[in-house]
């Protein structure tokens, strides 16, 4: 189901799954493969989260060198859908080259594009992102795009062929939670492709808020990997995403300035 669909129009079947680039998934939690103490912990956390998709930094994770521990031996491609990403790329050329190498290595064409502006904030460079997106789409890739929370750029990315829009909630690895709910709501309401919060989630309540706003899914890495107990946090995130989605579909009560008694006042003794 696309995020812009309202709760009233949801069917039981569409509620249970979401689809990106023609691929359907049940889990709405995507997890990363960085910052864990080892691949075994990473794999255990991904399973505890109930994740079906794991995102992989092609430039930082060992996928092909058999002399070193291989991610694929722990987080198995037969168990998870790999989503190669361009973490660490600061130019469109680097991003395009990285994803072409990923496709050659593993045959992956569903990818996550991120082109960063500077090492301090890791904000996306939106001009470079849009330029490289067009090149990748022309080259046959299905591209999910990390972007700013700017509704105008989100629309431009979708028009350029992005299969999913992934606005940041806060800077990557900051754990600050969703800082601009208004813009995120606007992006969700206008999008005809899935919208996922990408970056900034710090704890379970942040994930729940993103889902309550109507996101199709949440992507996170540091919130789980740097928790004191990554496996327990992965479980918490799984339940938070489910709870947030259920709350969105249920439709929250209206906020009121004054009290409204839970029990009727008529007929008091």
Curated annotation (Swiss-Prot):
Q: Which catalytic reaction applies to this protein?
A: [ThiS sulfur-carrier protein]-C-terminal-Gly-aminoethanethioate + 2-iminoacetate + 1-deoxy-D-xylulose 5-phosphate = [ThiS sulfur-carrier protein]-C-terminal Gly-Gly + 2-[(2R,5Z)-2-carboxy-4-methylthiazol-5(2H)-ylidene]ethyl phosphate + 2 H2O + H(+)
The pathway this protein participates in, as annotated, is:
Cofactor biosynthesis; thiamine diphosphate biosynthesis
The record's subunit annotation is:
Homotetramer. Forms heterodimers with either ThiH or ThiS.
Q: What HAMAP family does its record include? A: ThiG
Q: Where in the cell is it found?
A: Cytoplasm
Sorted alphabetically, the Gene Ontology cellular component annotations on this record are: cytoplasm
Q: Which Pfam families match?
A: ThiG
Primary localisation category: cytoplasm
Locate the active site: 112 (schiff-base intermediate with dxp)
- Supply the name of the protein: Thiazole synthase
Primary role: Catalyzes the rearrangement of 1-deoxy-D-xylulose 5-phosphate (DXP) to produce the thiazole phosphate moiety of thiamine. Sulfur is provided by the thiocarboxylate moiety of the carrier protein ThiS. In vitro, sulfur can be provided by H(2)S.
InterPro entries (UniProt xref):
Aldolase_TIM, Thiazole_synthase_ThiG, ThiG
Which species is this record about?
Caulobacter vibrioides (strain NA1000 / CB15N)
- Give the EC number(s) under which this enzyme is classified: 2.8.1.10
Q: Which residues cross the membrane?
A: none
Give the UniProt keywords, A-Z. Answer: Cytoplasm, Schiff base, Thiamine biosynthesis, Transferase
The family classification in the record reads: Belongs to the ThiG family.
């Amino acid at each position: 189901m696309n995020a812009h669909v309202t709760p009233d129009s949801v069917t039981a079947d569409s509620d249970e799954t979401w689809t990106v680039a023609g691929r359907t998934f049940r889990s709405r939690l995507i997890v990363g493969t960085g910052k864990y103490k080892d691949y075994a912990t990473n794999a255990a956390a991904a399973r505890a989260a109930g994740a079906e998709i794991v995102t992989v930094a092609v430039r930082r994770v060992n996928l092909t060198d058999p002399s070193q521990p291989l991610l694929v031996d722990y987080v198995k491609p037969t168990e998870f859908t790999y989503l190669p990403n361009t973490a660490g790329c600061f130019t469109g050329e680097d991003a395009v080259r990285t994803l072409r190498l990923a496709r050659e290595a593993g045959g992956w064409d569903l990818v996550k594009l991120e082109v960063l502006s500077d090492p301090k904030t890791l904000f996306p460079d939106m001009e470079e992102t849009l330029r490289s997106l067009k090149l990748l789409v022309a080259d046959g890739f299905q591209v999910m795009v990390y972007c700013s929370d700017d509704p105008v750029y989100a629309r431009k990315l979708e028009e350029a062929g992005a299969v999913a829009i992934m606005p940041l909630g806060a800077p990557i690895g900051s754990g600050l939670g969703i800082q601009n709910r208004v813009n995120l709501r606007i992006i969700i309401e206008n999008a005809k492709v899935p919208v996922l919060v990408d970056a900034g989630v710090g704890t379970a309540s942040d994930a729940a808020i993103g889902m309550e706003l109507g996101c199709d899914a949440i992507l996170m890495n540091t919130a789980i990997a740097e928790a004191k107990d990554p496996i327990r946090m992965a479980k918490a995130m799984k339940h938070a995403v489910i709870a947030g989605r259920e709350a969105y579909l249920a439709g929250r009560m209206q906020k009121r300035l004054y009290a409204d008694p839970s029990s009727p006042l008529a007929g008091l003794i």
